């Protein structure tokens, strides 16, 4: 049995094993979120883009500081960096989103060689990153409109003024769910094998950005001994 036959067999077995939604619903949602992301005003406003970048940098520093003990563990460092870089990645995420916009038009081909749950998990992670940008953009807009710098007193004012507490709580809940889902699928030998075999095909078909994003998430979460201890307060 050659590599392609193995890949098709494992994907078939995984589809029988998995009962969750296929990739198309997740990718359809991702396509809509990418369109909304591209329409965000900071793409055409350099001053607002700079303010958002400063807000994201502040958020990265805050998270590193408040979770210093958690990230100090060697097993947790990779996942901590992955979450922070993806949620507050700035220009790095802009490049990824641009690549994904071109890729998602051909999304129906994905189900032929990448396990559905791996794709849906990757799509969920990107959607979470877009949601984080939307929330931080609200803060950046407030700071810009009120001519405030990005520091702790100003950020406290911005958080209170924007009053997006429920949206922030939902963001945390969705992020936890994504982490649990990723951890669950990572424990599946069938998914891991099928996903690994799909790499060369994914690259050849032009799906490298999404494949690499999923692979980075899997690699980051793998060393964690207890995902519950990592994400629950």
Which ranges hold each PLM region?
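Intrinsic-disorder-associated, low-complexity terminal segments enriched in Asp/Asn/His/Tyr and depleted
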Residues: 2-5, 16, 20
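Extended, well-ordered protein cores
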Residues: 25-233
């Amino acid at each position: 049995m050659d590599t392609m036959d193995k890949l098709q067999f494992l994907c078939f077995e995984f589809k029988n094993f998995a009962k969750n939604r296929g990739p198309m619903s997740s990718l359809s949602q991702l396509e809509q979120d990418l369109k909304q992301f591209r329409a965000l005003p900071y793409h055409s406003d350099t001053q607002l883009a700079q303010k958002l970048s400063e807000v994201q940098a502040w958020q990265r520093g805050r998270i590193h500081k408040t979770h210093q003990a958690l990230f100090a563990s060697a097993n947790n460092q990779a996942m901590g960096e992955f979450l922070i870089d993806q949620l507050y990645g700035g220009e790095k995420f802009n490049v990824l989103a641009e690549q994904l916009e071109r890729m998602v038009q051909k999304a129906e081909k994905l189900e032929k060689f990448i396990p559905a749950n791996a794709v849906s998990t990757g799509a969920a992670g990107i959607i979470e990153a877009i949601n984080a940008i939307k929330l931080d953009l609200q803060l950046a807009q407030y700071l810009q409109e009120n001519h405030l710098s990005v520091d702790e007193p100003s950020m406290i004012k911005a958080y209170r003024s924007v009053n997006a507490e429920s949206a922030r709580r939902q963001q945390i809940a969705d992020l936890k769910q994504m982490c649990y889902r990723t951890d669950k699928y990572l424990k599946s030998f069938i998914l891991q094998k099928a996903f690994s075999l799909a790499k060369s095909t994914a690259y050849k078909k032009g799906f490298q950005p999404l494949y690499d994003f999923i692979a980075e998430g899997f690699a980051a979460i793998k060393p964690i001994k207890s995902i519950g201890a990592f994400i629950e307060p």
